[in-house]
């Protein structure tokens, strides 16, 4: 997948709103593989909706979203399964980790789908983000900031053309935010992928090829 295109997309909930000044909604926007994008939004402007459209969880919009030249509304369940396994990695704002499983088990569930990383590579990620001592601790016993780091590791243990990170550092201090951003970008460069980061304020401090106001 080389491009994600939004062609005049508008959530149904905003259809009667004539005052939309978004740089995404009702516009033609192209996200290219290899580039980094920051999508900034105020509360209630559709940030979570935007992410749900890209990952295929919702389709309640007018206009077109294309993966390369393919309209995503024509995609079937099997197509989406493959996209989420091979093309788009999604770091959920709400994380969606399994609290009864350990940090390593949460990551390994994802890694088993493709066998993309070795156990040693995964452990190196934990070490780098300062949570090696949490490797075998149940996620439900960890702080939200620690859980965010586990979720980032999980997002990086698969092949992808784009990584979609929804408010990835909301509960991290500047040092941990920087470390997580650096690790993400190293994996992105290894894979030649694109990055879409969303934020309603705090975001990873790094170079963005384009900043869009939702």
Give the location of each predicted region.
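Hydrophobic anchor residue at the start of the ABC signature
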Residues: 152
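Conserved ABC transporter NBD signature motif
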Residues: 63-72
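Conserved ABC ATPase signature
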Residues: 138-142, 146
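Helix-to-loop junction immediately C-terminal to a conserved catalytic motif
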Residues: 55
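Conserved ABC ATPase "signature" region
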Residues: 71, 119-134
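ABC ATPase NBD coupling module
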Residues: 72-89
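Catalytic Walker B motif of ABC-type/P-loop ATPase nucleotide-binding domains
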Residues: 163-166
